[in-house]
Amino acid sequence: MSSPERALLNLLTDIALSFDGAILGLTLAVSAVGSALKYASTNAALKKIKDAPEVSISDLRSLLPASEDKSETNDNRKSNDQRIVVVRGVVKPKISGDEGYKNNNVLISPETGDKALIIQRTQTYVYSGWKRLFQSTGHRFMLERSLRKHGADFTRTVPFVIVGKDQQSNSSFVAVNMDGSRQPLPLTTVYNRLQPINSSFLQAFLYPDYPVGLLDIEKILPPGKDITAVGIYSFNNGVPEIKSCQDLPYFLSEMTKDKMIEDLMEQTNFIFLGSVILGIVSVGILSYAAVRTWNKWKQWNHQRELPQRPNDSVVDDEPEDADEIPDGELCVICVSRRRVPAFIPCGHVVCCRRCASTVERELNPKCPVCLQSIRGSMRVYYS
């Protein structure tokens, strides 16, 4: 780890532990609240998927009223009968117009020539340089490797439908509406190639980071793939349609409904446990910081009120040379003045008046010999 990184780490540590750890406690509390909100949303999604009926493609029309099936709905009109359903089937291109258009309603991968309904291509630059030789063991290097470098990302899609797996004809289907879908797609990687980029010696010498390759990845959704769709089912101009629900983490997936429920239950338990741990730790740290702040405030208030009290003068009225005082009568704290007052209630005479006054000003005054809590002191006179 380099010196600037070490200095930055020390600065962040000092900030987190400042105010008796209150900053760290507040940070953990905010993280706990975020985890609790994440748990609530994940648990709500789990409940929706559990309650969603899993039906076959041919039985979908029975879920909505017949009037909705026959009516021509406007794009701006939202049906009150929309509901979340789970269907499983095979994806096929949507046939529009004559039958001869079927073969042209698919995409062709430019690299492999495979037919596809969705093509997603990602191009990412791979960097190298002499700077990475000195950061190969640091946390900064690990963070940089996890970040995405500049590149290109584009997706092409064609209209497609889901039909029953054992269905002989395409009379029963549900159209897939991809508008507004942000969930991950069940794509298959068909092309993965690292294309080297020639760099000059001057570029490698002057620039700490320079591109050495272009990683080109192509993923497709091939026709005939078995998938599960979970989303909002409705009719669009009399055509059954399913679109994504923004509250759910899945839309098109290779997992079955039972696998989705199992996966969400694991996520829910993990998020719940994490939020509980973060909450307990944050409450403990904030409680510790609050107690420390309260004690400091009491001590400050106690010291502020001391000058207002009618105290005896702490100036020695019996100045003596320390060499003339026997060892058994010297103050155990300063070892330069005679022991005068006795602490109450233990009765020990071990301090001079000045040191005894200092001990009494403490937040929790104790006798320096027996460590018993004291209420004050009184002068002892010897006859």
Swiss-Prot record:
Pathway: Protein modification; protein ubiquitination. Residues 36-269 are chloroplast intermembrane. Keywords: Chloroplast, Membrane, Metal-binding, Plastid, Plastid outer membrane, Transferase, Transmembrane, Transmembrane helix, Ubl conjugation pathway, Zinc, Zinc-finger. This is E3 ubiquitin-protein ligase SPL2. The lineage of its organism: Eukaryota, Viridiplantae, Streptophyta, Embryophyta, Tracheophyta. SUPFAM superfamilies: RING/U-box. It is an enzyme of class 2 (transferase). PANTHER family: E3 UBIQUITIN-PROTEIN LIGASE SPL2 (PTHR47355:SF1).
